């Protein structure tokens, strides 16, 4: 894991973003600055190999069933060549169970966004210009879907996290609220502790537009969904979970 240091960072979408006028980015506004406590974040998403150890030790259900698409795992196992690929077809509840087992947590939205874009508010983890060759996406995947979690080092974030854009969407801890960024901007701590949707971030191999790969982008999905383009990574607070 890598330490993400304390310090004021930029969150949300501002006028310099090429998608600022898109209605789908309204939930990413306003842009604001905030200082959140330091924390550790996984360099990579959790892999099939890591998740297998969790399933074997705890008896948790394997990700061999999917809400959409065909799962990678079959009969509790995954293809050997997928060992270092991110585990997919995991619900938010599955991801949370893994984190609990590992003594870790899912990142909050603000933790995730700060780790992806650094202190300077860059639009993508590598800078402000879209480059389809710096992350796994629909246009460069060929006949493949996911890739190994250490792929595309040239697209790593300023802190050194891989695949914060592309490969798989990543679960965050937060419940979705359409005006959450308005609350963050005025330092209002009353975010929901229940709801209908959780949030994922980062875009995936399934996307062909730059819009979802931006660091500020997020979409609400059902926490029970298990789909072929969603995985997760873990965080740890300094001094504990």
Where are these regions (language model features)?
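Short, compositionally biased
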Residues: 1-64, 92-93, 120, 127, ...
């Amino acid at each position: 894991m890598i330490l993400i240091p304390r310090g004021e960072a930029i969150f949300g979408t501002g006028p310099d973003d090429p998608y600022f006028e898109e209605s789908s980015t309204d939930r990413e506004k306003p842009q604001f600055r905030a200082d959140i406590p330091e924390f550790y974040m996984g360099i990579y998403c959790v892999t099939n190999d890591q998740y297998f150890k969790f399933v074997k030790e705890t008896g948790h259900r394997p990700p061999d069933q999917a809400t959409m698409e065909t799962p990678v795992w079959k009969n509790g196992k995954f293809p050997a060549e997928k060992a270092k690929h991110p585990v997919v077809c995991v619900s938010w509840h599955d991801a949370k169970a893994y984190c609990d087992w590992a003594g870790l947590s899912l990142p909050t939205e603000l933790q995730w966004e700060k780790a992806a874009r650094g202190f300077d508010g860059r639009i993508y983890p590598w800078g402000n210009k879209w480059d389809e060759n710096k992350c796994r996406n629909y246009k460069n995947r060929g006949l493949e879907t996911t890739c190994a979690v250490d792929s595309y080092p040239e697209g790593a974030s300023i802190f050194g996290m891989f695949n914060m854009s592309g490969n798989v969407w990543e679960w965050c801890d937060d419940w979705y609220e359409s005006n959450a960024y308005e609350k963050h901007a005025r330092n209002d701590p009353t975010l929901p502790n229940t709801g209908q949707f959780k949030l994922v971030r980062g875009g995936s191999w399934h996307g062909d537009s730059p819009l979802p790969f931006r660091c500020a982008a997020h979409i609400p999905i059902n926490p029970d969904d298990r789909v072929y383009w969603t995985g997760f990574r873990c965080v740890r607070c300094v001094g504990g979970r």
